Amino acid sequence: GTGGLTRLVDKRLVRRDVADLFCTKAEGFRARDAVKYTLVDDSFPRSKWDEKIAEVSAASAAKAQRGDVGIPLPPVVSEVSDDGALRTYKYVELSLNADDRVATITIHAPKSPPPADAAALRAEGADTWVFRAFREFDNALLHLRFNHAEFGLITIRTQGDAAAVLAHDGALDALATDWLATEIRLFQARTLRRVDNTARSIFTVVDHGSCFVGSLFELVIAADRSFMLEDDDGEVTVQVSSASAGRLPMSTGITRLQARFMRDSSQIDAALASDGPLDAPQAFDLGLVTLAPDEIDWDDEIRIAIEERVSLSPDALTGIEQNLRFVGAENCDSKIFGRLSAWQNWIFQRPNAVGDEGALTLYGHPTRPKFDWNRT
């Protein structure tokens, strides 16, 4: 398939004419030619197979040897309400509104101080907020993906002390050379990339008590739309930090600020240079949020936007989202998991497009198409 073709030339960097030959050569390549043309890394005779594989494995393990003991990763657990509509983790809540096909994920700020050093980070292990909150968030996204395909919209909220979030982010940054801190940062980045590659509409809602700062601010600019309340006292704020400057990259290798402000890089500089909390007018002027309604219009703006979104074809939304989220040059990851998966492997094969009652079949007819609301 096209995913395999992309991996040939973009991942293994096989010469394009050799890849063309390989893809059309019915009998394939023997081992010697496969190695020559870099289709495989090496080839061993059966008599030496076990010995050579052990050597390769040992060499690979030696490259990653840190001399440190890992930390236990207990299962991510949650409590589920009797009706299944609420799933509660330690730092995350997942609420399901089946009637509207809308899921709400709320991430809570930490209530304890951050680890003071590498030893304290190891002592907290998988329970430290910067790791556990993101594991729970990741688990909630996967739960929606595999168990609730009919939910087309995810609204993301946060609650808690913004200063506590920044303190925990700062503690992780201070341990830049520590292997565990590095692995946690990499996991955070992977989780945020899962948001980018989630085939659901994503709205971020910034209102009273929100703590979209530091690493959590990435969820504001990862969303398809963001709504920020313009309150009279200016207490609703967001804050950009060094977390948005490169340590949490997208699949394409650029930051979400770069993807957002591809036309004018000076806006990236302005966002990163913003000092401290930003209220709704300031965030809107910097282009960091989509809409900033006041308290009079807030409820109606959110309601109308949600009702409008869930009424649209889920396949059309998947196509729109996967094209608009990944701005700029493609790479192997974004080709396979972005537009390619959305369009070729999903949209154009679905009854919503080509079925008897699909949108393409009924285009130009007075009859409205009937959609299967399930998402990938």
Task: Go through each PLM region and give its residues.
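C-terminal alpha-helix plus adjacent terminal tail
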Residues: 13-36, 42-219, 226-235, 270-285, ...
